[in-house]
């Protein structure tokens, strides 16, 4: 379901949304998922860009425009069998985002072509996206993708007052049962990263630890916990950079 919303105000979701399939939401002025709100869908995409087209055969979504709005998530959002994607100049997550065995992306890039998970690759492909109005990403809540992929990416230019990415919450791609841990990427192409939360990519009983990649063009300050443990019964540790 594609919903291009042309409104002078942010779209406010204060109650519940339930859907089995993919839900695409576009509003240049942003979105507010209020405290106590609940979203349970197959997959969710919310962006301040205009969605020009979607190719169901390749999973390619073409974004245009740089909406100035913010996406602020304070509620519980769950993708039962797919992905969650937030694409806006500013993103604040103080709620819970969950996509078991799926992919979650928070990105300030809102121009170009985005490739959805399950098509050209395992997870989101944001290589062809860019932005001219990026600000920051703040993560204070919980993000989990059991054995899946989480990307937090900002190309905002770092200022003296604010890092491009600031994460104090939980980020978890550990897998339950047997299997390998997932993949986490936190990328600040033009700015700094401050990380003081817990980041986990642990294996299950039998499996290898996953991968945690944190790269900042300017400064990186990490005072939190980073874990990519191998399985409790068998398996090797993962990779942290």
Language-model-detected regions and their locations in the chain:
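Extracellular and secretory-pathway beta-repeat/beta-biased strand scaffolds
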Residues: 1-241
């Amino acid at each position: 379901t594609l919903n291009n919303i042309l409104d002078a105000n942010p779209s406010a979701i204060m109650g519940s949304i339930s859907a089995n399939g993919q839900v695409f939401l576009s509003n240049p002025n942003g979105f507010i998922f209020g405290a106590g709100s609940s979203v349970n869908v197959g997959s969710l995409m919310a962006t301040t860009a205009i969605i020009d087209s979607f190719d169901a055969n390749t999973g390619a979504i073409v974004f245009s425009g740089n909406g100035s709005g913010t996406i602020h998530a304070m509620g519980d959002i769950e993708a039962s069998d797919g992905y969650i994607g937030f694409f806006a100049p500013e993103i604040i997550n103080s709620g819970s985002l969950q996509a078991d065995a799926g992919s979650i992306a928070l990105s300030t890039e809102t121009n170009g072509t985005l490739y959805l998970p399950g098509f050209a690759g395992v997870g989101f492909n944001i290589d062809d996206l860019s932005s001219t109005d990026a600000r920051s990403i703040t993560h204070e809540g919980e993000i989990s993708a059991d054995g899946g992929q989480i990307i937090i990416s900002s190309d905002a230019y770092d200022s003296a007052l604010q890092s491009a990415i600031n994460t104090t919450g939980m980020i978890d791609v550990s897998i339950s049962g047997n299997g390998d841990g997932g993949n986490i990427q936190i990328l600040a192409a033009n700015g700094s990263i401050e990380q003081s939360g817990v980041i986990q990519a642990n294996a299950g009983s039998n499996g290898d630890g996953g991968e945690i990649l944190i790269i900042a063009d300017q400064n990186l300050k990490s005072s939190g916990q980073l874990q990519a443990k191998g399985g409790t019964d068998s398996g090797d540790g993962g990779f942290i950079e």
